[in-house]
Amino acid sequence: MTVPPNVTIAEARYAANDAMTLTQEYIARKLKEARKNEDDSDGYAEIPVKANTRLKCAAVLVPLAFSGGEWHLLFTRRTDRVQSHKGQVSFPGGACDEGETTPEQTALREAEEEIGMQRGDVQVLGQLSQLITISSYRITPVVGVIPFPYAFKVAGVEVARVFTIPLVWLSDHNNYWEFLLRDSERSLITYHPFDGELLWGATARMTVTFLKTIGTLTGK
């Protein structure tokens, strides 16, 4: 891995600590603590979930990359040729294949298929709480550190662009907002555009959940 073992990000905008040391070990510990304290009511559902609700299994990779002296999250923008979520910003991921027994298997396979990220190049740190989407998927986000830069090989039918956004920018409460949807108990999270890309919806919620878990969000 090309990521330094101990990376200090000194930014006054970080609420948890102005000189927070965001190491891989720290992030992994916070993810483990969050999952340990979860119960069945944790997570977020975009639809009412009843006893007879049939949910499809899915997983995404939340890729952490170290570049320019700071951590970034890596995203993709989907093409207009995919069946769903055309042109939207997302994490690499998708539905579970038959025979896959863990979210990690699904997330790493999808990342390899979509952006050419070899499974052995990802250092998995942990998982976030599950998210149930309006399309009836139960998504498990898998957080992993990736080498960067990287010789990505994108699946041209699915992925239009691969890009990163700094954690510092994502953690700034001035860059996103959450609002309740009309006639609904659900809310929507959306970010201001970054480098021409709009991060919103389920991917934005997973992003904010990750930032809350590691303690970098400011002001909210």
What residues fall within each predicted segment?
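N-terminal leader/linker segments that precede catalytic domains of diphosphate-processing enzymes
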Residues: 1-90, 95-113, 117-149, 180-220
